[in-house]
Amino acid sequence: MMEETLDRDGIKCKPGAVELLEDLKKRHITAAVATATDLERTEKYLTLTGIRPYFEKLICATMVEEGKPSPDIYLYACKQLGLSPGQCMAVEDSPNGVLSAYRAGCKVVMVPDQTQPDAELKKCLYACVPSLTEISHLV
């Protein structure tokens, strides 16, 4: 049912996503996706939104042993990019995503979606911003 709705109505990016990705591209900053979604759906969603070309790598939970909040997906993403976790910034919208990136050693920026960070989660954050439009100056 969800797939039919997506095929019919499409899918929209979060506000500021295209502008952020365009800014990163202009600055020659590599972007990757580290998601709990499988590769087929990830490719489909990114293609439908028109942002697939901005990402050098797509890393999905099926490519690693343990999913978020384990650090596996971020450690693997960093390895695929040829970067150390300390050279990477993760943008996350969920507590499990924040914990995953933090445990891997990445700087983590949270853009809360359904869950606001509690005091413990805030300790893991480099920054917490209300929207993707607030990220470019942090990179």
Indicate where each model-derived feature is located.
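Pocket-edge positions in alpha/beta enzyme catalytic cores
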Residues: 9-12, 34, 65-66
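Asp-based, Mg2+/Mn2+-dependent phosphohydrolase catalytic module
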Residues: 22-25, 38-39, 43-139
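Hydrophobic beta-strand core positions in alpha/beta domains
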Residues: 32-33, 110
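Intrinsically disordered/low-complexity terminal segments and short unstructured peptides
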Residues: 4, 34-36
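Metal-dependent phosphoesterase signature
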Residues: 1-19, 27
